[in-house]
Each structure stands twice: as C-alpha cells, then as structure tokens.
Design a protein with these regions (language model features):
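Conserved S-adenosyl-L-methionine
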Residues: 180-265
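SAM-dependent Rossmann-like transferase core, predominantly class I methyltransferases
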Residues: 157-191
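Non-catalytic nucleic-acid substrate-recognition regions in nucleic-acid-modifying enzymes
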Residues: 3-144
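Short glycine/proline-rich turn/loop motifs
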Residues: 103-105, 167-169, 252-253
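Generic beta-structure capping elements
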Residues: 47, 103, 151, 158-164
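Short, low-complexity, intrinsically disordered N-terminal peptides in bacterial proteins
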Residues: 1-8, 247, 251
C-alpha cells in the first residue's frame, strides 16, 4: 500500500490570527477531516492527499505540519527523551539537513534555545544509533524542519510538510518595504466577500498583492503551483500521486473580464 493511500494522519495548519475559521472551511473543501480551530491555526485529519492538496491549494495557511508525536513533560530531559523516542530515520534520510524550531505557551522551561538544542541532539542521537551518522544542521535552508509546540505540561512534535512558508507563492521576484504577505492578502479578499463580477479597488496597493491574490482566486489558479514543498523530501512522499494532483490542477477557469484597480498615491 502506498503511503499516500493511508488515512488517519494528523496535521496542523498555521495561519494569521483572525483567519482560522476561513481556513477551516477551506481545508474542509480540500478533503480535511475533523477540523478543529485553535488560535493561530486549524488541526485536522486526513490522508496524504489532503496534505498535498492543502499545500497546493490553500490560500490562507502559512504552513502545514504533520504530527509525529505527543508527550507529557516537566523539564528539558523529558523533552529530550520524547524526541529521542521518535523513529526519525523512518521519516527522512540522514543525508537531509535539519532545523528545529520550538515555540511555547506557559511552558515551565527556562530557555527555549536550550530546549531547541536538546531536541536537535535527540534527533541526531537517534540517527547516530540507527545509522552511525548524524544529520547536518542548516538554519537557513534546511531540507527538514522539526517543529515543537509546548504547553504547560504537554507537547507535540511535527514535521513541516510545507518547507518555505506557504505565503511564498513563487511569483514574487522581490519584496518592497514591509510587504503584505500573500495569505493575509487572500484572507482580506475573502473577508470582503468580493464577487468576481464586481470591481475591486485597492487605493494603497503597494506591490499589488491583494489584487494579484484576487485575480488568482478568480482564475482558480493553485497558489502553490510554482513552488516546491517540504513533503517532497520525506520518505512518505508519493511522487506519482503528487504529479497527478499537479496535472489536475493545471486547468484554471477560463479567462474572465476582471475589473481590478490599484493605486499607491
């Protein structure tokens, strides 16, 4: 059985605050199951097709994370043991570069930097025990991102299926000063309840991000079509299924006359 056909995975899609309800509806339309809204994102279940579709089609998500473990903890060593207990070589090759990110709410840990170091050590130690090698760390452009979310006494470990944040659509060649992120721009368009046959004016358009996102929505263009994703570097990656999904997404709606206007003066 291919990895993509197995159901029952758990994911978490992060998003700008205020867009969680819209994101839950969007993910549901893309095949997500049991969506649960929390501040800053949406937890959901599904198979790998749902994960691929969320990365390819979500206009609102910032990242789609795959949950690989949950645990209780009281200190740094509990965190190390929880991360060491995950069979990381099952998920990615030792030759992949690695980055660990830790975020926390009401955590008793004194230093998140030290917690990050301990999780990194745990992942590398697990690989050393299994393969005799340790993955290299790359903080700028890693192949694999491990995310750790900590609450007061519980935590979860995730693998990032997105790679670069999803608001990086792949079309922007440069960024002006304080650019509006694409997923936030898409959320503003959705919240406006703009209809495609109506004019849309952005009187402070800057780089035109709101108008570009509006045009992409009207055309039915997949926002992730021109970029790569973190899941392509995981062992669970099903290339034929992914290529099929991309082929099926390359048929946007026929061109329509849009009235989009932008000004920055």
């Amino acid at each position: 059985m291919s990895a993509v056909s197995q159901a029952g995975e758990r994911f978490f899609a992060t998003a700008p605050r205020g867009l969680e309800a819209l994101l839950a509806a969007e993910l549901g339309a893309l095949g997500a199951k049991d969506a649960a809204i929390v501040p800053g994102g949406v937890a959901f279940g599904g198979d790998w097709r749902a994960c691929y579709a969320a990365n390819l089609w979500s206009r609102l998500a910032s990242r789609v994370l795959w949950r690989v473990a949950e645990f209780g903890y009281a200190g740094d060593e509990d965190l190390y043991e929880a991360a060491r207990g995950v069979d990381w070589p099952r998920y990615f090759d030792v030759g992949r570069t690695l980055r660990v990110n830790v975020s926390a709410t009401k955590s008793p840990l004194k230093s998140l930097d030290f917690a990050t170091l301990r999780v990194k050590d745990a992942v590398c130690d697990r690989f050393r025990d299994a393969t005799g090698r340790r993955p290299d760390v790359d903080r700028r452009r890693p192949d694999i991102r491990v995310h750790v979310f900590l609450e007061a006494a519980r935590g979860a470990l995730y693998l990032d299926t997105s790679g670069e944040p999803l608001f990086k659509r792949g079309w922007r060649s440069g960024a002006g000063e304080a650019p509006l992120r694409e997923n936030l721009a898409a959320g503003l368009v959705m919240l406006s309840e703009w209809k495609f046959d109506e004019p849309l004016l952005d009187p402070m358009c800057g780089a035109g991000t709101i108008l570009v996102e509006a045009a992409a929505m009207a055309r039915g263009r997949a926002p992730g079509m021109k970029r790569s994703f973190g899941f392509e570097k995981l062992k669970a990656f099903d290339s034929p299924a992914w290529e099929k999904m991309k082929r099926e997404s390359r048929n946007p709606s026929p061109p329509r006359a849009l009235r989009l206007f932008g000004s920055d003066r």
